[in-house]
Amino acid sequence: MPPPIGYCPAVGFGGRHERSNAELLAAHVAGDRYAFDQLFRRHHRQLHRLARLTSRTSEDADDALQDAMLSAHRGAGSFRYDAAVSSWLHRIVVNACLDRLRRAKAHPTAPLEDVYPVADRTAQVETAIAVQRALMRLPVEQRAAVVAVDMQGYSIADTARMLGVAEGTVKSRCARARARLARLLGYLNTGVNIRR
């Protein structure tokens, strides 16, 4: 059973100390049964958004996020504290998404055009769908890099650490992704509608 809202095991009810991500992770490793839940809740929205941007469907994103959180929960003891806990969590989520994409690549379940139903015809919704479709057409490595840098706001260095590649690799993946996105989405600036 989760602790009551406002309860922090370190200080009790009404305490003013909010534990840092590193403190929560260390408390989890030390046996605090509420610490990981608190850490996960703190980052859930951003991690889910990252998973959604890196996955083909919302179901894949949910599954990848669950896989990532189980992996983080189990592997917390091996965290070396040489990077921010949030960067570590993001890397685990990205890796879980990429793993699912690689496994699904051999067995596609639906054509890309069928994945995103378009019920609302407003320009904003159409643009968001077009961008999401264009992202899905990128190779997974390019997509992960450009989502982290351009959509999540991570630096090249942080993205390189999250993805486990060199900074130059992140730069080249982002450049290739941006060039392809510009080609795929160039029609948005012309007022011309593409075939659905």
Swiss-Prot record:
More details: Extracytoplasmic function (ECF) sigma factors are held in an inactive form by an anti-sigma factor until released by regulated intramembrane proteolysis (RIP). RIP occurs when an extracytoplasmic signal triggers a concerted proteolytic cascade to transmit information and elicit cellular responses. The membrane-spanning anti-sigma factor is first cut extracytoplasmically (site-1 protease, S1P), then within the membrane itself (site-2 protease, S2P, Rip1), while cytoplasmic proteases finish degrading the regulatory protein, liberating SigM.
Protein name stated in the entry: ECF RNA polymerase sigma factor SigM
Source lineage: Bacteria, Bacillati, Actinomycetota, Actinomycetes, Mycobacteriales
Residues spanned by motif Interaction with polymerase core subunit RpoC: 63-66
Keyword set, alphabetical order: DNA-binding, Sigma factor, Transcription, Transcription regulation
Region entry Sigma-70 factor domain-2, spans: 39-105
Protein family according to the UniProt entry: Belongs to the sigma-70 factor family. ECF subfamily.
Positions of region (Sigma-70 factor domain-4): 130-181
Traits of the deletion mutant: No effect on phenanthroline induction of katG.
Keyword Metal-binding appears in the UniProt entry: no
Pfam families: Sigma70_r2, Sigma70_r4_2
Protein purpose: Sigma factors are initiation factors that promote the attachment of RNA polymerase to specific initiation sites and are then released. Extracytoplasmic function (ECF) sigma factors are held in an inactive form by an anti-sigma factor until released by regulated intramembrane proteolysis.
Known partners and oligomeric status: Interacts transiently with the RNA polymerase catalytic core formed by RpoA, RpoB, RpoC and RpoZ (2 alpha, 1 beta, 1 beta' and 1 omega subunit) to form the RNA polymerase holoenzyme that can initiate transcription. Interacts (via sigma-70 factor domain 4) with anti-sigma-M factor RsmA.
PANTHER family in the cross-refs: ECF RNA POLYMERASE SIGMA FACTOR SIGM (PTHR43133:SF50), RNA POLYMERASE ECF-TYPE SIGMA FACTO (PTHR43133)
Keyword Transcription regulation (UniProt): yes
GO terms (BP aspect): DNA-templated transcription initiation
Record-level Gene Ontology MF annotations: DNA binding; sigma factor activity
Organism: Mycobacterium tuberculosis (strain ATCC 35801 / TMC 107 / Erdman)
Highest taxon in the source lineage: Bacteria
DNA-binding region ranges: 156-175
